[in-house]
């Protein structure tokens, strides 16, 4: 079991290193996003947050769907836990996994360039809240899905595109005006932009606005997840 957890945590770290080596090597001398900040340095916070988001989502969604399919979810439901406690347990576990993977990605990639920490409190705030958002989204997906194919569709058609189009590899100011407008409707963009602000002190939008959007999105998805748990949607009926 320990080796399985280690493998699941190591895989996203290796993926992030590959992204950094390929994009950083190819575009380092051709892309300048912020003054005095190299493209490789710009990439690292985005890759850290991308890994954190994807693994926070995977932790709750895969745990829940696996329990539903194998039939052992009944033992969780029989425990004297309220829907609030159920929600907190799954989301806190997602936060922990997301932070562990994110830290692993950072430690593996920070050797490629010099990274600064302008505002560590912003880094921590966006990491925690964003992991909670994806943990709650994972709960929604895990409750809704009846099989792994449905969960994969949710991840492939929503989580992955929203993450990849959130400014991990670019600043939205480099996009045409139409796509800049579209990007502002993507809550994942505010997670990554605010997280990156904590490292460099510069961002595409105000970190306070990003924080308000991310908090609002958490209240939305958290409310939906709690409602699904309270009514027993696809869990008790």
Describe the role of every protein-language-model region.
Residues 1-237:
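Hydrophobic transmembrane alpha-helices and immediately adjacent juxtamembrane helices
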């Amino acid at each position: 079991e320990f080796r399985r957890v280690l493998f699941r945590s190591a895989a996203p770290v290796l993926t992030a290193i590959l992204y950094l080596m390929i994009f950083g090597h190819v575009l380092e001398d051709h892309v300048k996003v912020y003054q005095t900040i190299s493209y490789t340095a710009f990439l690292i916070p985005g890759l850290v947050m991308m890994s954190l988001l994807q693994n926070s989502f995977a932790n709750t969604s895969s745990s829940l769907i696996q329990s539903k399919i194998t039939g052992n979810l009944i033992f969780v439901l029989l425990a004297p836990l309220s829907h609030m406690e159920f929600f907190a347990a799954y989301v806190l576990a997602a936060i922990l996994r997301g932070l562990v993977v994110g830290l692993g990605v950072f430690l593996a990639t920070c050797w490629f360039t010099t990274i600064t920490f302008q505002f560590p409190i912003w880094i921590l705030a966006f990491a925690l809240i964003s992991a909670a958002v994806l943990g709650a989204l994972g709960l929604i997906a895990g409750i809704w899905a009846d099989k792994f194919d449905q969960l994969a569709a949710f991840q492939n058609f929503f989580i992955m595109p929203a993450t990849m189009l959130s400014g991990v590899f670019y600043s939205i100011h480099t996009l045409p005006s139409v796509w800049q407008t579209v990007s502002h409707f993507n809550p994942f963009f505010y997670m990554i932009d605010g997280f990156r602000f904590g490292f460099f002190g510069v961002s595409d939008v105000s970190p306070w606005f990003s924080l308000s959007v991310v908090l609002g999105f958490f209240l939305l998805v958290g409310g939906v997840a709690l409602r699904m748990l309270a009514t027993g949607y696809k869990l008790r009926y």
